């Protein structure tokens, strides 16, 4: 799902929904006022788009230059962005980066270093959430720090894997394992890379080092032909930005808390939640598409070639836009949304819990980690609890339809496919909106008020299915189908 960083950026875009008039005084404060945004919001938006000229500078003046120059450029530009947005509070990220380097050097490739990193970085982030918490989204230093926290935890695990026997590692772990010893400058450049410092995406140290060495290009020895792919993602991001800016005054989460919403018919309350649930995610889509374009332009988005020779620029993709817009399944939305963060959790949390021997338990603990990483508000826990519940029920329903001859035949009727799709999408986005209500309102008094107004529909619906579908499965699936499945 979305992160705290994503929520802060989303609030930024929500604030920037004025008529965009021209201004004569270009001071940040007056410009922000004329745009209907806060100065802090304008600084953030400016910083995200600043990645494009920085990437162009890197391409034309630093590509294939000495590694230390590239690390210095990335570290200095990222620190400058941090200072520009958060003033002296940029020291929080700098402190964690330096201490992380010391942990790697002093503790080495040990499990102790991994646990120390996990405990320290998460504790620092959660303490930041606690001491800066308010009832609303604020643009503060914890926004990029949650992105940095995952980077540094992943760095420690990859460094630990680099000291293990290669044969004991999976192919994925071998790909990310760090064989060398990172210098402080390398860790700083990796941490402060301008295209991902504020809102992501996540990427590994090994991938970053390939960028520094000039290996992330479709034309060896030359700059990558990534300008057009980068502009395509930027253009798509701008389309979402314009759409969100125009519609955001009319579709707000604040309306969910109004008396007018409470007095509307039940069907209206559900339909508003459905539309809002789809629309609210567009603010995250916008930011990820824009930052993906920065990563592509610099070369970091290079991901090799297809079998037919087509270049892939999706190494830093956080969105699969077509899948996101068309999938009728909750798991489809999860697979298309915040891809790199989800991949990070799968790689470093979910798969590392394999020793538990229970996939559902591993999934539940992974989602609990995600909820805590987002923040200390109860709404995050409720949102990811709903995701866990919905995914289990969706899997039950899929198995039932697949294994039941009657339901399988009914589902395969071509003439009814549009109707099925409409029903699926309605259920899908209604309960995505239901889950996002807790995520976006995040304090218990707010999300509880909205859930009461629709009678806890999401919990009632999915908990009922969770307990009844196994009995329906027993009744509708012949014994031979069950035996075949076991085989």
Swiss-Prot record:
Q: What coarse category fits the chief subcellular location reported for this protein?
A: endoplasmic reticulum
Q: Where is this motif: Di-lysine motif?
A: 484-487
| InterPro entries, per database record | LPLAT_7/PORCN-like (IPR049941), MBOAT_fam (IPR004299)
* One Gene Ontology term of the molecular function aspect: lysophospholipid acyltransferase activity
Localization terms from the record: Endoplasmic reticulum membrane
- Which sites are catalytic? 338, 374
Q: In which pathway does it act?
A: Lipid metabolism; phospholipid metabolism
Top EC category:
transferase
- What kind of membrane protein is this, topologically? Multi-pass membrane protein
Where is the PTM N-acetylalanine found along the chain? 2
Keyword Cytoplasm among record annotations:
no
Please provide the Gene Ontology terms (biological process) for this protein: chylomicron assembly; endoplasmic reticulum membrane organization; intestinal stem cell homeostasis; lipid modification; negative regulation of inflammatory response; negative regulation of response to endoplasmic reticulum stress; phosphatidylcholine acyl-chain remodeling; phosphatidylcholine biosynthetic process
**A Pfam family recorded for this sequence:** MBOAT
Family listed: Belongs to the membrane-bound acyltransferase family.
Q: What role does it play?
A: Lysophospholipid O-acyltransferase (LPLAT) that catalyzes the reacylation step of the phospholipid remodeling process also known as the Lands cycle. Catalyzes transfer of the fatty acyl chain from fatty acyl-CoA to 1-acyl lysophospholipid to form various classes of phospholipids. Converts 1-acyl lysophosphatidylcholine (LPC) into phosphatidylcholine (PC) (LPCAT activity), 1-acyl lysophosphatidylserine (LPS) into phosphatidylserine (PS) (LPSAT activity) and 1-acyl lysophosphatidylethanolamine (LPE) into phosphatidylethanolamine (PE) (LPEAT activity).
Q: What is known of its domains?
A: The di-lysine motif confers endoplasmic reticulum localization.
Q: What is this protein called?
A: Lysophospholipid acyltransferase 5
Q: Which organism is it from?
A: Rattus norvegicus (Rat)
């Amino acid at each position: 799902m979305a992160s705290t960083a994503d929520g802060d950026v989303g609030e930024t875009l929500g604030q920037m929904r004025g008529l965009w008039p021209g201004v004569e005084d270009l001071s940040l404060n007056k410009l922000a006022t004329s745009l209907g945004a806060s100065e802090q919001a304008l600084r953030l938006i400016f910083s995200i788009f600043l990645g494009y000229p920085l990437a162009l500078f890197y391409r034309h003046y630093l590509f294939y230059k000495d590694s230390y120059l590239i690390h210095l450029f990335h570290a200095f530009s990222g620190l400058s962005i941090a200072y520009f947005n958060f003033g002296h509070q940029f020291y929080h990220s700098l402190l964690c980066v330096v201490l992380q380097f010391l942990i790697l050097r002093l503790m080495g490739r040990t499990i102790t270093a991994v646990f120390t990193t996990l405990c320290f970085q998460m504790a620092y982030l959660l303490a930041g959430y606690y001491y800066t918490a308010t009832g609303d989204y604020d643009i503060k230093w914890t926004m990029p720090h949650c992105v940095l926290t995952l980077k540094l935890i992943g760095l420690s695990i990859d460094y630990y894997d680099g000291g293990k026997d290669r044969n004991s590692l999976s192919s994925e772990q071998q790909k990310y394992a760090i064989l060398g010893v990172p210098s402080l400058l390398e860790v700083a450049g990796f941490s402060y890379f301008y295209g991902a410092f504020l809102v992501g995406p996540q990427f590994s140290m090994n991938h970053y080092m390939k960028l520094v060495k000039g290996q992330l290009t479709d034309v060896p020895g030359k700059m990558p032909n990534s300008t057009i792919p980068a502009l395509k993602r930027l253009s798509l991001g701008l389309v979402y930005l314009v759409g969100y800016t125009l519609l955001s005054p009319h579709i707000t989460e604040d309306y969910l808390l109004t008396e007018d919403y409470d007095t509307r018919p039940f069907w209206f309350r559900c339909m508003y939640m459905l539309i809002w649930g789809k629309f609210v995610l567009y603010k995250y889509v916008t930011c990820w598409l824009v930052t993906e374009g920065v990563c592509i332009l610099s070369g970091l988005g290079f991901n090799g070639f297809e079998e037919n020779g087509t270049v892939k620029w999706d190494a830093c993709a956080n969105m699969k836009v077509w899948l996101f817009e068309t999938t009728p399944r909750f798991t489809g939305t999860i697979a298309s949304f915040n891809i790199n963060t989800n991949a990070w959790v799968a790689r470093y949390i979910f798969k590392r819990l394999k020793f538990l021997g229970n996939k559902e338990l591993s999934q539940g603990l992974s989602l609990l980690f995600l909820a805590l990483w987002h923040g200390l508000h109860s709404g995050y826990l409720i949102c990811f609890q709903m995701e866990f519940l919905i995914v289990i029920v969706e899997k039950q329903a899929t198995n039932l339809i697949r294994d039941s001859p009657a339901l399988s035949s009914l589902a395969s009727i071509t003439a009814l496919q549009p109707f099925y799709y409409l029903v699926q999408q309605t259920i899908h986005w209604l309960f995505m909106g239901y889950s996002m209500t807790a995520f976006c309102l995040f304090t218990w008094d707010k999300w509880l008020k909205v859930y009461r107004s629709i009678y806890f529909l999401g919990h009632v619906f999915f908990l009922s299915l969770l307990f009844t579908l196994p009995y329906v499965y027993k009744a509708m699936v012949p014994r031979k189908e069950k035996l075949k499945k076991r085989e």
